[in-house]
From Swiss-Prot:
Protein EC: 3.1.3.15, 4.2.1.19
An individual GO BP term: L-histidine biosynthetic process
Amino-acid biosynthesis keyword on record: yes
Cofactor note: Binds 2 Mg(2+) ions.
Pathway assigned in UniProt: Amino-acid biosynthesis; L-histidine biosynthesis; L-histidine from 5-phospho-alpha-D-ribose 1-diphosphate: step 6/9; Amino-acid biosynthesis; L-histidine biosynthesis; L-histidine from 5-phospho-alpha-D-ribose 1-diphosphate: step 8/9
Known catalytic reactions: D-erythro-1-(imidazol-4-yl)glycerol 3-phosphate = 3-(imidazol-4-yl)-2-oxopropyl phosphate + H2O; L-histidinol phosphate + H2O = L-histidinol + phosphate
InterPro entries given in the database record: HAD-like_sf, HAD-SF_hydro_IIIA, HAD_sf, His_synth_bifunc_HisB, HisB_N, Histidinol-phos, IGPD_sf, ImidazoleglycerolP_deHydtase
Record-given protein name: Histidine biosynthesis bifunctional protein HisB
Highest classification ranks of the organism: Bacteria, Pseudomonadati, Bacteroidota, Cytophagia, Cytophagales
Keyword Transit peptide among UniProt keywords: no
Keyword annotations of the record: Amino-acid biosynthesis, Cytoplasm, Histidine biosynthesis, Hydrolase, Lyase, Magnesium, Metal-binding, Multifunctional enzyme
HAMAP family, alphabetized: Bifunc_HisB, HisB
Top-level taxon of the source organism: Bacteria
Organism: Spirosoma linguale (strain ATCC 33905 / DSM 74 / LMG 10896 / Claus 1)
GO cellular component, one term: cytoplasm
């Protein structure tokens, strides 16, 4: 299915002059910094269809004659075309706000054709500098990129929290005033996975965003296990939520093993075909302990474990399950793991392992925007 980037015009691609907010002469045509170069890269480096959607209040009336609009608009279009930026469609609504027209943003009256099954609106984006652009994304079932140039309109509007509905907050995936950041976001889409694993022993839900901010939401029923999984999220930079309902009244084994299996599966799915990743990835000290974790997302599971624990449990987690956790992760993530730790304090040793594990993952999944067509293997597949 075809994904689309719906792009606002005034305030997003070109400056919106004040106070009349009308680009009605060539003298008023001023491109937003980096918009042309970023749009060229988006057009050349991604598969999104580019669609312009703009409200032009009263176009064709005495307050905004057509002959003052088209010269600047056509110059803008020819400038983009000269940089290999070709819009599949340009939708212009001419109504005033008080007309309450369904074709005026955030209405979707001009855009009904994109609800056809051949379009993937769920993975499409609306880029604009107004909250009406965010609402348009909600109405389309797409995601929103709120463009916020310094002292721009969106910066003022977004300060009014009451203007943002919960649906709008959920729709916004990026707020920025930098077109280069928009390009990188579209070129490097978030790598996410949702895994649900349900057996007679455990019910597990894992939500993973490899390109998150290190946010953690752990509820396994085992406090120390939650603490270790928090380290994975924090030190890998991934957003990770794990909710488990396990048979802890019998034993901790199923909860820990099945969580690792689901987590490994989430990483395997989120990595996709692994193009552009570093693939390999850590020595990490914690007080007297030193952990070494090497990882290779090779497509082949293997675990080398050189770690000895003298206590039966640390917190409420059996130490015998440490090996089992990483073995299960390796099995479903299809990765090689080489883990070694030295130290005296048992808590420090296992926490150092989990932190080093997270850092190794962070290194291995890092993408190079200039290597996205390259697979880090001479075999041609991972």
């Amino acid at each position: 299915m075809q994904k689309i980037v719906f792009i606002d015009r005034d305030g997003t691609l070109i400056a919106e002059p004040q106070p009349d907010q009308q680009v009605d002469s060539l003298a008023k045509l001023d491109f937003i910094p980096k918009a042309i170069s970023a749009m060229r890269k988006i057009a050349e480096d991604t598969t999104y269809e580019l669609v312009m959607v703009t409200n032009q209040d009263g176009l064709g009336t005495g307050s905004f004659p057509e002959d003052t609009f088209w010269p600047a608009h056509n110059k803008m279009m020819s400038t983009f075309a000269g940089e290999n930026v070709n819009f599949a469609a340009v939708h212009i609504d001419r109504h005033f706000p008080h007309d309450n027209s369904s074709t005026r943003k955030p209405g979707v009256g001009m855009l009904t054709q994109y609800f056809e099954a051949s379009y993937d609106l769920t993975n499409s984006f609306v880029i604009g500098d107004r909250l009406t652009d965010v609402q348009l994304a909600v109405n389309l079932g797409a995601k929103a990129i709120l463009f916020m140039p310094p002292n721009g309109l969106a910066a003022v509007q977004s300060a009014d929290v009451s203007g943002l509905t919960e649906a709008m907050k959920q729709a916004i995936v990026l707020q920025t005033g930098d077109w280069d950041e928009i390009y990188e976001f579209l070129r490097l889409p978030a790598r996410t996975a949702l895994v649900e694993r349900n057996t007679k022993e455990t019910q597990i839900r894992v939500e993973l965003n490899l390109d998150g901010r290190g946010r953690a939401d752990m509820h396994t029923g085992l406090g120390f296990f939650d603490h270790m999984l928090d380290q994975v999220a924090k030190h890998s930079g991934a957003d990770l939520a794990i909710h488990v309902n396990g048979d802890l009244h019998i034993d901790e084994h199923h909860t820990i093993e099945d969580t690792a299996l689901a987590l490994g599966e989430a990483y395997r799915r989120a990595l996709g075909d692994k193009r552009g990743i570093s693939r390999y990835g850590f020595l990490l000290p914690m007080d007297e302990a030193l952990a070494q974790v090497g990882i290779d997302f090779s497509g082949r599971p293997w675990l080398v474990w050189d770690a000895e624990f003298k206590r039966e449990k640390i917190g409420d987690m059996p130490t015998e399950m440490f090996y089992h956790f990483f073995k299960s992760f390796s099995d479903t993530a299809l990765c090689n793991l080489n883990i070694k730790v030295e130290g005296d304090n048992e808590h420090h040793k296992i926490e150092a392992i989990f932190k080093a594990f997270a850092k190794a993952i962070k290194m291995a999944v890092r993408r190079d925007i200039n290597e996205l067509d390259n697979l880090p293997s001479t075999k041609g597949v991972l």
